Amino acid sequence: MIYLIIILLKFQKNLYDLLYSVIIKEDYLRNINGILLLDKPIGLSSNLILQKIKKLFKAKKAGYIGTLDPIASGMLPIFFGDATKFSDYLLNTNKWYKIKAKLGEKTNTLDSFGKIICIRPILNIKKLNIEKILSEFQGEIYQKPPMFSSLKHLGKPLYKYARQGIYIPREKRKVYVHYIKLLSFSKKYFSLTIKCSKGTYVRSIVDDIGEKLFCGAHIVKLRRTKLFNYKESHMIDSNKLYNIKKKFNDLKKLDECLLPIESIFKKLPIIVVNDDIINRLRNGIKLNFWKIKKNNLFKIISKDTKKFVGIIDINKYGRANSIKLIK
């Protein structure tokens, strides 16, 4: 009987702790809006660092675009609150990388985080050999996604199949490399800079270069330096964020690290409307903008508050095709 009472008391305590944590969590989390250009550290998955940053900011809603491999560092855009509505406008933008690769070794993940599966001699490779091969990867190319990737097959990421030793056939996909340039070359290593389209696997490019050099190659360092119009200088690393939190113990100081949502749309033409029009748009009322005779995406600015409230796609007949507004 005593044991039964103890079990019931433990169950009651666990249930209380669970309910308490859920209630506190909901009250504790904040509705914040903005974009953090995180300098992702090496060794963590993009999703894991997202959860850490979300917890640090005590944010109710957050997401990211442009997955970076655990080996990679650099720009990982994290979107908070209403900013998540507009993240898809960065999905198809170009990305810039700096890469360091090692010759003579091929790994199962195509980077140094994997297992070496083949070692071959490096035979008389010259700088000109590499530069000539690089020219073959400029422009429109077709590449097969690596098995160790987050690309899904039947709802399951490919890397999970790879870890189980299951091979999944993949079709080649078209990507675009705007430029690829050799930065340095030594006997065992070479460094590149590359600007490429969405969906480009730079690990696969390095692996293909290694095969064309008949010795194999894999990435040992990978850093995303730029995405869209955001530059490397705009990034902030997680250590700095934690230091800000520790020093000031003020979430508003962390919020100062966020870029406004409208930073995505700096180059868009502006349409200024009063709050009455904005409220009608919020309520789903279709309006015509007869004075606009050009098919374009516009940034909406409130005439009353002078603040960004969303974007609207207007066709050449002055009709709104689509609208996205912040709350």
Swiss-Prot record:
GO biological process: mRNA pseudouridine synthesis; tRNA pseudouridine synthesis
Alphabetical list of SUPFAM superfamilies matching this protein: Pseudouridine synthase
Gene name, Swiss-Prot/TrEMBL: truB
Annotated active site: D69
Enzyme class: isomerase
One family name in Pfam for this protein: TruB_C_2
Higher taxonomy: Bacteria, Pseudomonadati, Pseudomonadota, Gammaproteobacteria, Enterobacterales
Record's keyword terms, sorted: Isomerase, tRNA processing
Protein name: tRNA pseudouridine synthase B
Similarity comment: family membership: Belongs to the pseudouridine synthase TruB family. Type 1 subfamily.
EC number, as in UniProt: 5.4.99.25
Residues annotated as binding substrate: Y97, Y201, L222
Source organism per UniProt: Wigglesworthia glossinidia brevipalpis
Function: Responsible for synthesis of pseudouridine from uracil-55 in the psi GC loop of transfer RNAs.
